[in-house]
From Swiss-Prot:
InterPro entries tied to this protein: UDP-glycosyltransf_plant, UDP_glucos_trans, UDP_glycos_trans_CS
Top-level EC class as recorded in UniProt: transferase
Pfam families in the cross-refs: UDPGT
Name this polypeptide is given: UDP-glycosyltransferase 13
CDD domains linked: GT1_Gtf-like
Amino acid sequence: MSASDALNSCPHVALLLSSGMGHLTPCLRFAATLVQHHCRVTIITNYPTVSVAESRAISLLLSDFPQITEKQFHLLPFDPSTANTTDPFFLRWEAIRRSAHLLNPLLSSISPPLSALVIDSSLVSSFVPVAANLDLPSYVLFTSSTRMCSLEETFPAFVASKTNFDSIQLDDVIEIPGFSPVPVSSVPPVFLNLNHLFTTMLIQNGQSFRKANGILINTFEALEGGILPGINDKRAADGLPPYCSVGPLLPCKFEKTECSAPVKWLDDQPEGSVVYVSFGSRFALSSEQIKELGDGLIRSGCRFLWVVKCKKVDQEDEESLDELLGRDVLEKIKKYGFVIKNWVNQQEILDHRAVGGFVTHGGWNSSMEAVWHGVPMLVWPQFGDQKINAEVIERSGLGMWVKRWGWGTQQLVKGEEIGERIKDLMGNNPLRVRAKTLREEARKAIEVGGSSEKTLKELIENWKKTSRKT
């Protein structure tokens, strides 16, 4: 086969991007993965992005992978006052959804013709019909755990089954196929507000998952306890699309940031002695909780690397560390650890020999990065899917979480308790052993013949068949 014939036989896959780094990061990683598996890739973007971090990530991806094509999706004007939320990401999702009919001509104009459309999970209900209208296979890229995916699919039926939804109690449970029931106390509070824009989108998306050709999830079979094949057999019998484990989706070169000071500090620390503390880009702890966390880190007696964030998204923090923590506390902290307000290269930190534990919000991307590097976690959920993810991490044996930490219960966690939990994490040898085991399983999953590698190959072969029909 000539080089041109080989290129022509490659499937051409478009990825419809959403907004928010928690959604964008796995989409861009999946785009890079497809290129590495010899697929043509087009990403469909919309500007201006909500945050600078998003536009930067897209630009760096395109710079590192010049073979990826970008198509800009121009959105209709959208008046945010017509939506009952001020969240900039929810508003962007709605703006994209309302412009769905404009995507048809854009997809039709792409050359060579597309083999498949991969849609971010926040946009499914509006764009699966667009793909179907073009006789184009569509796939959901789900950006959280399989357990969370099953909950989102099941939630519309759960809502429909309740004659009085307002009577739901926190100790009620939601039955989800293939998994243990989800306590309502672990469900994001916004799910329980049926008048909220997010919940409207959630229910519509959950109903539309079944209309896609497959649901791609950043996970691997060993992390799921080997239950995915059985779940997919049942889904096939019920006429539902399969859960396709395509993870772990690895961090790419374009994600690296220049921040050498923390790494230099880590180089001087003993192996496995440092707890890394970071709560992601989407949520900021209150100033009171930041002070208690600082006190807890000191009380733990452990070395630590702490990324302090007091503003949401990628806004610059105006308060200095002195103002946030107080000069006396900051001086004590400097004796034990390294504190930084800038973002760090999380992959480089987690991969460092000195890091032996991770205090995290439980975002799925961060959780999968910890799995990849074999770092046990203390999960402190803050919002969204993070309590569900904490359950997954705990059941996998990779981490621990305190159920009364987070929304709906204890509002301010005191430093004394934080310190004790960090000591528990850093002294837990079974967690370390399990983390190393899952680290090896994660690598096996994407090697030739691994569970995720085989799944991806099967997808690509199916897309090649679509290419030959066009």
